[in-house]
Amino acid sequence: MNTQTTTLDNPSADATTPNGILHAFLAAWWHGNVGEAADQFSDRFTFTDHALGLEFKDKERLTEFLAKSREFFPDTQRTDNTIFSSEDGVISEWTLTATLSEPFLGGLMRNVPIRVQGISVVQMQYGKITRWSDYYDQQTARRYGLASRFTEWTEL
Protein backbone atom coordinates (compact mmCIF):
# COMPACT_ATOMS: atom_id res chain seq x y z
CA MET A 1 0.00 0.00 0.00
CA ASN A 2 1.33 3.43 -0.98
CA THR A 3 0.62 6.72 0.80
CA GLN A 4 1.11 10.12 -0.78
CA THR A 5 -0.12 13.70 -0.89
CA THR A 6 -1.09 15.14 -4.25
CA THR A 7 -2.84 17.95 -6.08
CA LEU A 8 -4.25 18.11 -9.59
CA ASP A 9 -1.08 19.63 -11.00
CA ASN A 10 0.82 16.32 -11.12
CA PRO A 11 1.03 15.49 -14.84
CA SER A 12 3.37 12.55 -14.26
CA ALA A 13 0.68 10.24 -12.86
CA ASP A 14 0.49 6.99 -14.89
CA ALA A 15 -3.08 6.81 -16.24
CA THR A 16 -3.12 3.00 -15.93
CA THR A 17 -2.50 2.87 -12.17
CA PRO A 18 -5.25 3.50 -9.60
CA ASN A 19 -3.57 6.81 -8.66
CA GLY A 20 -3.35 7.78 -12.33
CA ILE A 21 -6.97 6.89 -13.03
CA LEU A 22 -8.10 8.92 -10.00
CA HIS A 23 -5.90 11.81 -11.14
CA ALA A 24 -7.27 11.61 -14.71
CA PHE A 25 -10.84 11.77 -13.41
CA LEU A 26 -10.16 14.68 -11.05
CA ALA A 27 -8.14 16.65 -13.61
CA ALA A 28 -10.86 16.29 -16.26
CA TRP A 29 -13.59 17.24 -13.79
CA TRP A 30 -11.57 20.17 -12.42
CA HIS A 31 -11.08 21.55 -15.95
CA GLY A 32 -14.80 21.17 -16.73
CA ASN A 33 -14.41 18.16 -19.04
CA VAL A 34 -17.19 16.17 -17.39
CA GLY A 35 -17.61 13.78 -20.32
CA GLU A 36 -13.92 12.90 -20.15
CA ALA A 37 -14.22 12.50 -16.37
CA ALA A 38 -17.19 10.12 -16.77
CA ASP A 39 -15.19 8.12 -19.35
CA GLN A 40 -12.89 7.01 -16.50
CA PHE A 41 -15.80 4.83 -15.29
CA SER A 42 -16.48 1.30 -16.46
CA ASP A 43 -19.69 0.58 -18.38
CA ARG A 44 -20.95 -1.11 -15.19
CA PHE A 45 -20.27 1.12 -12.19
CA THR A 46 -21.79 2.61 -9.06
CA PHE A 47 -21.11 6.18 -7.97
CA THR A 48 -22.48 6.97 -4.50
CA ASP A 49 -22.48 10.33 -2.75
CA HIS A 50 -23.43 9.22 0.76
CA ALA A 51 -23.79 12.78 2.07
CA LEU A 52 -26.42 13.60 -0.55
CA GLY A 53 -27.99 10.15 -0.61
CA LEU A 54 -27.44 9.88 -4.36
CA GLU A 55 -26.37 6.88 -6.40
CA PHE A 56 -25.65 6.75 -10.13
CA LYS A 57 -25.19 3.70 -12.34
CA ASP A 58 -25.73 5.47 -15.65
CA LYS A 59 -22.99 7.56 -17.30
CA GLU A 60 -25.46 10.09 -18.67
CA ARG A 61 -26.83 10.84 -15.18
CA LEU A 62 -23.31 10.85 -13.71
CA THR A 63 -22.19 13.31 -16.38
CA GLU A 64 -25.20 15.51 -15.61
CA PHE A 65 -24.37 15.39 -11.88
CA LEU A 66 -20.73 16.30 -12.48
CA ALA A 67 -21.76 19.18 -14.76
CA LYS A 68 -24.30 20.53 -12.25
CA SER A 69 -21.72 20.26 -9.49
CA ARG A 70 -19.35 22.48 -11.52
CA GLU A 71 -22.23 24.84 -12.37
CA PHE A 72 -23.33 25.26 -8.74
CA PHE A 73 -19.76 25.54 -7.43
CA PRO A 74 -17.56 26.81 -10.30
CA ASP A 75 -14.64 27.78 -8.06
CA THR A 76 -14.37 24.33 -6.47
CA GLN A 77 -10.87 23.25 -5.54
CA ARG A 78 -10.09 19.76 -4.25
CA THR A 79 -6.80 18.86 -2.64
CA ASP A 80 -6.04 15.21 -1.96
CA ASN A 81 -4.27 15.31 1.39
CA THR A 82 -3.52 11.61 1.68
CA ILE A 83 -3.94 8.78 -0.80
CA PHE A 84 -3.79 5.11 0.12
CA SER A 85 -3.54 2.95 -2.98
CA SER A 86 -3.44 -0.71 -3.86
CA GLU A 87 -3.41 -2.47 -7.21
CA ASP A 88 -7.20 -2.23 -7.56
CA GLY A 89 -8.25 0.85 -5.64
CA VAL A 90 -7.62 4.13 -3.90
CA ILE A 91 -8.79 5.74 -0.69
CA SER A 92 -8.33 9.49 -0.80
CA GLU A 93 -8.68 11.85 2.16
CA TRP A 94 -9.35 15.29 0.71
CA THR A 95 -10.26 18.90 1.41
CA LEU A 96 -12.70 20.70 -0.84
CA THR A 97 -13.15 24.47 -0.95
CA ALA A 98 -15.78 26.41 -2.88
CA THR A 99 -18.09 29.40 -2.65
CA LEU A 100 -21.88 29.28 -2.57
CA SER A 101 -23.90 32.32 -3.64
CA GLU A 102 -27.17 32.34 -1.73
CA PRO A 103 -30.05 34.77 -1.14
CA PHE A 104 -29.72 37.06 1.84
CA LEU A 105 -31.81 39.79 3.46
CA GLY A 106 -33.71 42.18 1.21
CA GLY A 107 -33.10 40.22 -1.97
CA LEU A 108 -29.34 40.59 -1.72
CA MET A 109 -26.95 37.76 -2.48
CA ARG A 110 -24.07 36.70 -0.28
CA ASN A 111 -21.08 34.50 -0.98
CA VAL A 112 -20.57 31.79 1.62
CA PRO A 113 -17.13 30.12 1.72
CA ILE A 114 -17.22 26.34 1.98
CA ARG A 115 -14.45 24.12 3.31
CA VAL A 116 -15.21 20.46 3.83
CA GLN A 117 -13.09 17.39 4.43
CA GLY A 118 -14.05 13.96 3.20
CA ILE A 119 -12.89 10.69 1.78
CA SER A 120 -13.41 8.91 -1.51
CA VAL A 121 -13.20 5.14 -1.73
CA VAL A 122 -12.59 4.12 -5.34
CA GLN A 123 -12.42 0.58 -6.73
CA MET A 124 -11.08 -0.16 -10.20
CA GLN A 125 -10.96 -3.06 -12.57
CA TYR A 126 -9.27 -3.28 -16.00
CA GLY A 127 -8.20 0.38 -15.83
CA LYS A 128 -11.69 1.76 -15.18
CA ILE A 129 -13.58 2.89 -12.07
CA THR A 130 -16.21 0.37 -10.99
CA ARG A 131 -17.24 1.83 -7.64
CA TRP A 132 -16.83 5.32 -6.18
CA SER A 133 -18.13 6.28 -2.74
CA ASP A 134 -17.81 9.79 -1.28
CA TYR A 135 -18.22 10.48 2.44
CA TYR A 136 -18.34 14.00 3.91
CA ASP A 137 -20.56 16.23 6.05
CA GLN A 138 -23.50 17.40 3.93
CA GLN A 139 -24.36 20.39 6.14
CA THR A 140 -20.83 21.75 5.98
CA ALA A 141 -20.71 21.21 2.21
CA ARG A 142 -24.04 23.03 1.68
CA ARG A 143 -24.80 20.97 -1.43
CA TYR A 144 -28.54 20.59 -0.74
CA GLY A 145 -29.45 22.61 -3.86
CA LEU A 146 -27.41 20.23 -5.98
CA ALA A 147 -28.99 17.19 -4.34
CA SER A 148 -32.51 18.48 -5.00
CA ARG A 149 -31.84 18.38 -8.75
CA PHE A 150 -31.34 14.62 -8.59
CA THR A 151 -33.93 13.49 -6.06
CA GLU A 152 -37.41 12.49 -7.02
CA TRP A 153 -40.14 13.97 -4.85
CA THR A 154 -43.29 12.03 -4.07
CA GLU A 155 -46.51 13.47 -2.74
CA LEU A 156 -47.96 12.10 0.47
Language-model-detected regions and their locations in the chain:
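C-terminal and inter-domain tail/linker signature
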Residues: N2-L156
